[in-house]
Amino acid sequence: MKAREVNFDGLVGLTHHYAGLSFGNEASTKHRFQVSNPKLAARQGLAKMKALADAGFPQAVIPPQERPNLAALRQIGFTGSDQQVLEKAWRAAPHLLSAASSASSMWVANAATVCPSADALDGKVHLTVANLNNKFHRASEAPGTERLLRAIFRDESRFAVHGALPQVAMFGDEGAANHNRLGGDYGEPGLQLFIYGREESGALVPARYPARQTLEASQAVARLNQVDPQRVMFAQQNPAVIDQGVFHNDVIAVSNRQVLFCHEHAFLHQQALFDALAEKVPGFTPLVVPAGAVSVQDAVETYLFNSQLLSRDDGTMVLVLPEESRRHEGVWRYLNTLVAADNPISELKVFDLRESMANGGGPACLRLRVVLTDDERQAVNPAVMMDDTLFTRLNAWVDKYYRDRLTQEDLVDPQLLREGREALDELSRLLSLGNVYPFQQ
């Protein structure tokens, strides 16, 4: 059956700030306490969505979550009115107020793992919410993510949204950022490749930074998503690159249809993995970047692999990159060599996403890929699909509510909380979401 990939991009939230919350993510740590610009961040994300929609790639939006997350602060012992909770957290533990105010839900590659209907035993599209167990500021996203996904993928005859795995280290799950799908046409059954960083009894783990995804979590997600067992493989990411800042697989590899674009050091036992993929995926095309051309450090700094690989109707592919890749002489030289060579990648598209990039999130982090047939696409909440009207409305909404400067000190301001709730109340109507936010209950 004919199907297309729809990219659902996360809309940056009003509390986007730099707090260095993500140990193992070097950009996040490097830009700690810098001044952020939430308005610019949201506009940069919207510009990418609209440009890709205009280029013929179906595009939709996932709204931000309510932040500061007062329920999370109350759960860890801060009491009183909303304003008192903010003030007590700020005085006692500003890093916890930062965590509860994080706009990290913008990186929807970590929202869920998706199984297209062609790969599922029951013929439905499945989405399993990620628990993001490794980081407090992200683990609190799961309930909000589930509500938002249910408001977008409402038709239970076509879509199955599953809640997150248990919030324990054994089932640490980071969503689609550690998941690749390979195959032919999108509507045909494909092969799902789950990438993990550690397993419960395994000795091979990184030494410096945490491995956030477990094999046990990947296996559980595959079961929940009803992936045909004949169409799934599990592979371990190279622990050495995790220690160099590759905290998710989408920082060192990206796949699309038959192509896997990755670094020479991306996977443990990489050649054996490629041999297995070649047996299962007709026309499997690994495009491997040698360390001599691009080091792991340069890949992390430029987010060369945190890119989007998109298919045109003629079978060629477009690689969507952050501006940082163009500014690095060696990486840009390599990319131009790649495009000139005999492979499906025929064009580079570059976007300025520096507000997101400074927190460690590139083009791939900002999107959740969902393969949908025409009928399934018709069943998605139509209000979230990107077009001229939605683009204009969302930009006007951002201009109305977002600040152009935010520091950690601003998070205690009760006016920021009020602005956020007013904005999200309006957004929930604009996107026909219903009452999805806690303050609306």
Swiss-Prot record:
Catalytic activity: N(2)-succinyl-L-arginine + 2 H2O + 2 H(+) = N(2)-succinyl-L-ornithine + 2 NH4(+) + CO2
Catalytic residue list: 174, 248, 365
GO annotation, biological process: arginine catabolic process to glutamate; arginine catabolic process to succinate
Keyword S-adenosyl-L-methionine: no
EC number: 3.5.3.23
NCBIfam families, A to Z: arg_catab_astB, PRK13281.1
Subunit description: Homodimer.
Cited function: Catalyzes the hydrolysis of N(2)-succinylarginine into N(2)-succinylornithine, ammonia and CO(2).
UniProt record similarity statement: Belongs to the succinylarginine dihydrolase family.
Record HAMAP family: AstB
Database matches in PANTHER family: N-SUCCINYLARGININE DIHYDROLASE (PTHR30420:SF2)
Name of the protein described by the UniProt record: N-succinylarginine dihydrolase
Provenance organism: Cronobacter sakazakii (strain ATCC BAA-894)
